[in-house]
């Protein structure tokens, strides 16, 4: 997976987890603030509105609710000050307020502000007993950008489709020589000229494809659809003139009855199924490769939380396969008597077992605690690894979650996991020497 695509996938994953947490939160009265500011807004106007809201809050009869609302408004105003009256390029999302438990006691205070990974067009300000997350969910609509090349004997159009928005990037016409009906040397000469014109046309299309769909030496679309009414579309894809980086991104070649913008519209309609399944197609390919490694017992794979984390820490992992909803907590625990630290990865059920936090009768001190998936996302690059998110919405992904624990990896070299587990202490010492 290329860097820009992986970065976006990570941002989307983080937003999904944030939505899950925010949707569970409840506040006292109208004390939870949801504030979403698109880039076109003026921050001083928003600041003025928050100040006015603070003044109005003095009319709230309940002292507890009034204090909670005013505390949230104050925190919101303080956060906005950090931006020095300048909104980030993609706008700003802010959630603030005290979350209460079932007994009505303050359990946690949220103050979350961030720039979304792409521009947000929604304006929202709501004080409620819950956070409003629909604009975040709208951000997660699969809006990958796809490139289209509509080519025939009359010209070529280059366009993109992102969500419901299509854009024509560039188009040009061509006047190719027609077939010559007469015989003799004249026919041979015209055939040669005709072939030369076709090759020049294909070269121009291939060069323009690079201009439109490659930026900073990287393909800037998630996939390509090549469409046309004649054989040009197939010749282009098979041609050595067509950049191999783009050829690798071709998702489908479709026949359309028209060229130009009408052909663009028809190509979108005929490729709809392919475009909607692009994420699952990628997931199927990754999972098929993983299952093949397992079936052949290449020892260049691992699965399960314990084996995958050991392999990652020793630098053996090439690509981590992470189920997007993996529910494990990472603990770093310290024995207060010996000073020895250890790391545990626990399920919610294991966290309820107090024995996991006792060693030789000693209560272990928790130095670190946090969701394991977040630790992986924050640290995988330190070990030179790649990352692939896996869902349970494809058959292969669901099998990975059920049968392999939702965490696995492709390894750089063969690792005997049985030997790794048996000699864990020796491996830990080697890792300390190499990385500490």
Swiss-Prot record:
Cited SUPFAM superfamilies: L30e-like (SSF55315), N-terminal domain of eukaryotic peptide chain release factor subunit 1, ERF1 (SSF55481), Translational machinery components (SSF53137)
Instruction: For this UniProt record, give its keywords in alphabetical order, as a comma-separated list.
Output: Cytoplasm, Protein biosynthesis
Q: Which GO terms describe its cellular component?
A: cytoplasm
Q: Name one GO molecular function term.
A: translation release factor activity
What is the top-level taxon of the source organism? Eukaryota
Query: Where is this gene product found?
Result: Cytoplasm
Q: Which Gene3D superfamilies match?
A: 3.30.1330.30, eRF1 domain 1, eRF1 domain 2
**Biological function:** Directs the termination of nascent peptide synthesis (translation) in response to the termination codons UAA and UAG. In B.americanum UGA codes for tryptophan.
Quaternary structure and interacting proteins, as annotated: Heterodimer of two subunits, one of which binds GTP.
Q: Give the protein family.
A: Belongs to the eukaryotic release factor 1 family.
Q: Which PANTHER family match?
A: PEPTIDE CHAIN RELEASE FACTOR SUBUNIT 1
Q: What is this protein called?
A: Eukaryotic peptide chain release factor subunit 1
As recorded in Swiss-Prot or TrEMBL, the protein's gene is named eRF1
